[in-house]
A protein has these predicted regions:
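Conserved glycine-rich Rossmann-like NAD(P)H-binding loop of the short-chain dehydrogenase/reductase
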Residues: 1-15
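Residue(s) in the substrate-gating loop at a strand-loop-helix junction
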Residues: 117
Length: 170
């Protein structure tokens, strides 16, 4: 399976694509294509969809996995932090769904995985922007699952809710 590695940090995408090749994850004529994309931009996500189709001709699996965080007392978190977290964590998934579900359908089927968090199932203090966005991802993913089961059963949808994991998220 060929893979598009999309990240707002292009050198990180290039590094991961190289690791996939070095570790033997890519077999036969599969390749990893590193692409810089800011998922907070609907236009950039749409361009990612076009680039994916241009490079590989089909899309069968999408993982919406971008995430950022800001915290503090709900009423003291700067509005710019609220907007940033919502744009990346919720709107980025919405843009991914809107762009890639039609491409998966056109490609004959597949699956979309949206990463939420345990914070999307609970409401931990001092994490309101993150938790609100991840609750939205859970709700969107559950609705998407049912919508696809009726309209396009060849396409599945899942939501991933990991617990605390050491990442580069900030």
């Amino acid at each position: 399976m060929s893979i598009v590695v999309a990240d707002v940090d292009k050198p990180a995408a290039v590094e991961v694509a190289g690791q996939l090749a070095d570790e033997g994850v890519l077999v036969a004529d599969a390749r990893a294509l590193p692409v810089r994309v800011d998922v907070a931009s609907a236009d950039e996500v749409a361009a990612l969809g076009e680039a994916t189709m241009d490079a590989f001709g089909a899309v069968h699996l999408v993982c919406n996995n971008a995430g950022v965080s800001a915290g503090g007392l709900s009423w003291e978190v700067p509005m710019s932090d609220w907007q940033w977290v919502m744009e990346v964590n919720l709107w980025g998934v919405v843009y991914g769904v809107r762009t890639f579900v039609p491409l998966i359908v056109r490609s004959g089927g597949g699956h979309i995985v949206n990463t939420a968090s345990m914070a999307g199932l609970t409401s931990p203090p001092f994490m309101s922007p993150y938790s609100v966005a991840k609750h939205g991802v859970v709700a969107l993913s559950e609705a998407l699952y049912h919508e696809l089961s009726f309209s396009h059963p060849e396409v599945g949808a899942s939501v991933l809710c990991p617990g605390w994991v050491r990442t580069r998220i900030h």
